[in-house]
Amino acid sequence: MPLINSSFAPGQAQATVDAFQDPDQRQIAQAELYYFSGRAQECRNIAELYLQDKDLCLRLSAGLLYSFSNLTLGNPSASRMGFRNIQECLRLAEENSASEEVIASCVFAGYLATVLMHLPADGLPPLKDFLPYLPAGIRAYAIYILAHNAYLNEEYERALGLCQSVFLMLDGCYPIAMEYLYCVIIMCLN
């Protein structure tokens, strides 16, 4: 999720996408921007191209974007296929002794999918154990996922504390993660 991981000034998302040197990262970042802009069809069309990519991180991003865009489009069976793809990435990473960073990305994607779908995270290692291996923007979004899960479990004080801790550690403006963190804060205060 290269756009989520990017620090940029609000209003500069497209310029940030355009600045990616790697064409595949730029394409996935464009799919993210489409998704977060309510353009699910365009997001899905790009994500679909990367569902079987040999680069597990591109494949994970594609799986998440494909799954959630298909939910928006009313295609639950396609969405389930994307979620299975995420599970497969974790299995492949573990089998091939991938780096801690790649495994952390797989665990993050698994938690993102299960928590936001309100499903149990059975079989996934604890996300908190992998936070140090995630880059700053993804780490901030991962903590949002932990906070969202705490909220779902009615642990409102914990959710607030997690959100507040992210703002203390950020070294820049990560608008996507920050927006979702603010949403959890508002949910907890209601």
What are these regions (language model features)?
Residues P2-A9, Q25-E42:
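Alpha-helical segment of the N-proximal tetratricopeptide repeat
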Residues P2, Q25, A29, S61, ...:
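"A position-specific structural signal for the A-helix of alpha-solenoid helical repeats
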Residues L3-S7, Y34, N70, T114-L116, ...:
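Residue at a conserved register position within TPR or TPR-like alpha-solenoid repeats
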Residues Q21, C57, E100-I103, G137, ...:
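Residue signature of alpha-solenoid helical repeat architecture, marking inter-repeat boundaries
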Residues A13, C43, S79-G82, G123, ...:
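Single-residue signature of alpha-solenoid repeat helices
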Residues Q14-D24, L131-P135:
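TPR-adjacent "capping" and linker segments in tetratricopeptide-repeat scaffold/adaptor proteins
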